[in-house]
């Protein structure tokens, strides 16, 4: 397959380069990624500033470009200007940290994949759980991404669906399997700590602890139980459950 590879951690991040090195052995890969760390940029795009594109050399034989914009910019610029028309799939990752539960709404990784789907290119986001002060398991995550990719044939790919793949932090032997599941609730209970600086201004820092109230059958639940999770996402945010009710309420 012809694959466009991007991320939100930046073009020099270990995750995207681990994935590129493995995928390029079996597929044609073009990397277009932010020049710097752009985590939690969600689906933001650059409007008021020019976007700078630089060609980057990689140790493995792939075409690579850094972009001064956001992850969503990377996909937009790539599909409009940099890559051929025959891209079969956009893959975003491997992200340093999970993208499950409500966190997907903040994720630049997931949003880059969604941008691909908005361009009618099938897409997948790949994220690996990160534990502070421990070595990331990008090689395991890359293996699972390749496994998912190899299960697909071009005719199987739906161009409006984003596959969200998350890999727990554990050894390959400890992984219990793969679960196709729905999005869960929030991972963390977040809050802001407050300090006062020398000039009397409030200084707020985001803090939080793990949310223990999780729902069975969700990505959050299965990740905590050492399963790889795969969730199909869609960019249509319509709440169909109350569409008719809303019409009756406001138009009747």
Swiss-Prot record:
GO terms for molecular function: 3'-nucleotidase activity; 5'-nucleotidase activity; exopolyphosphatase activity; metal ion binding; nucleotide binding. A divalent metal cation binds at residues 8-9, 39, 95. Gene3D superfamilies: Survival protein SurE-like phosphatase/nucleotidase. Its cofactor is a divalent metal cation. Keywords: Cytoplasm, Hydrolase, Metal-binding, Nucleotide-binding. GO terms for cellular component: cytoplasm. InterPro entries: SurE (IPR030048), SurE-like_Pase/nucleotidase (IPR002828), SurE-like_sf (IPR036523). Its main location: cytoplasm. Its EC number is 3.1.3.5. It catalyses: a ribonucleoside 5'-phosphate + H2O = a ribonucleoside + phosphate. It is found in: Cytoplasm. Binds 1 divalent metal cation per subunit. Nucleotidase that shows phosphatase activity on nucleoside 5'-monophosphates. Belongs to the SurE nucleotidase family. This is 5'-nucleotidase SurE. It comes from Clostridium botulinum (strain Hall / ATCC 3502 / NCTC 13319 / Type A).
